[in-house]
Amino acid sequence: MSGTKFRTGGTKEDDLLEFVKVGKLLEVKDLIENQGVKADCKDEDERTPLHWAAAKGQISVAQYLMDNCKCSPNTNDDGGWTPLTSATSAGHTHMVKLLLEFGADPNTVNDSKRTPLHYASSKGRSDIVDLLLTHGAKNRKDDTGSAPIHRASSNGSVATVERLLKGEANINSTNNEGDTPLHIAAEYNHEDVVECLLKHGADTTIENKDSKTPIDMSSSQTIKYLIKEFKK
């Protein structure tokens, strides 16, 4: 990838990175426009200033880097993370919106095969999930075979599960262990998510690799009752 690498040690690139993190736009502009520091320079982990602006939620800095400096929102660090992945993982809704407006790829995949949709779903951020789906995010599986709806079911966010299902997530998708979202929600005793999945037609009879159905996964008597009732 293009760009100058920098490491800690008091260089101007180090200064740029620190100013980006704390949102000091005037200092960022001075280093780039007057002192010759490249706006797309990289640290030892291949992260650009835009990665850090995204991770820290520094909107004005990110806007400047993309608008004035033409920094790409789709540059990968050494783990395959883009600024959008960083912003999503950190839960910065307005940053996610800005990056998408500047053409960030909602289906970017990191080294764990996780997309921004996985991270938003893991954190139960239905607002960010909605933004990503509206901009064309797909329900893909990561390296554990988990789709975003598995992550949302683990988190326990009904709103996120509902939005993913509206976005055509496969309610009976299985991960590498053979678990469906219903298995996951039952295992974590998320009663509301279990009820939501059941109402949307989740299959209660699917067995995972341990030959367990969702009802076998839960220690909650309420969940066991719900599943039994929906099986009738």
UniProtKB/Swiss-Prot annotation:
The gene is psmD10. PROSITE patterns: ANK_REP_REGION (PS50297), ANK_REPEAT (PS50088). It comes from the Eukaryota. ANK repeats lie at residues 45-75, 79-108, 112-141, 144-173, 177-206, 210-232. It comes from Dictyostelium discoideum (Social amoeba). Acts as a chaperone during the assembly of the 26S proteasome, specifically of the 19S regulatory complex (RC). This is 26S proteasome non-ATPase regulatory subunit 10. It holds the Pfam family Ank_2. Keywords: ANK repeat, Chaperone, Repeat.
